[in-house]
């Protein structure tokens, strides 16, 4: 009985300390970026796409995290990246296709909550169809995007 009481008191003290710590957060322990603080910028060379860097720097070595916002009816053209990229769909449906010929009708829908991995050096294209899509992309920089078919020729 005494051992049970001692355990209960110990657990109560530990839980009480955890709650006290959570209530008075130590600044600098967690970096928080609220959605209303995100400064979206136009993605160079891809009208209709905006992005924000949340962590790291994609052009430098190391981990980076970005979000990209695709306006309705906006898709990238066939391209590849030198690094693996890990993509989580945050909002809407994101459409992904593979190959050097741009064929939006052959893309696969990835709804909000879905996940995809871009394999380094593999050609793909992606974007939004009828609704806005927001994706979060992470990888190890330096990142790059190499367009394969700059003219964006469609499948005939």
What positions do the PLM features span?
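Short beta-strand His + acidic residue motifs that chelate non-heme Fe in jelly-roll/DSBH
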Residues: 76-78, 96-97, 118, 123-129
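Conserved short histidine dyad/triad with adjacent acidic residue
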Residues: 61-81, 109-110, 119-120
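Bacterial N-terminal signal peptides
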Residues: 3-16
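Double-stranded beta-helix
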Residues: 28-31, 105, 125-156
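Short acidic-glycine-tyrosine-enriched beta hairpin
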Residues: 94, 100-121
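Glycine- and acidic-residue-biased ligand/ion/polar-headgroup-sensing regions
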Residues: 71-74, 80-101
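Soluble periplasmic/extracytoplasmic beta-strand elements of cell-envelope proteins
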Residues: 53, 69, 95, 134-138
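A short, N-terminal "cap"/entry segment at the start of jelly-roll beta-barrel domains
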Residues: 18-64, 151-156
């Amino acid at each position: 009985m005494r051992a049970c009481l001692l355990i209960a008191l110990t657990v109560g003290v530990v839980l009480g300390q955890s709650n006290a710590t959570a209530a008075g957060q130590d600044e600098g322990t967690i970096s928080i970026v609220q959605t209303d603080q995100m400064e979206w910028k136009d993605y160079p060379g891809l009208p209709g796409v905006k992005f924000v860097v949340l962590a790291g720097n994609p052009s430098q070595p190391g981990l980076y995290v970005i979000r990209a916002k695709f306006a309705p009816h906006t898709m990238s053209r066939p391209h590849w990246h030198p690094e693996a990229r890990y993509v989580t769909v945050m909002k809407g449906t994101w459409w992904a296709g593979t190959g050097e010929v741009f064929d939006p009708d052959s893309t696969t829908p990835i709804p909000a909550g879905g996940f995809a991995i871009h394999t380094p050096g593999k050609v793909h294209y992606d974007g939004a169809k009828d609704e806005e899509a927001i994706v979060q992309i992470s990888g190890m920089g330096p990142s790059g995007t190499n367009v394969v078919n700059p003219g964006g020729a469609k499948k005939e």
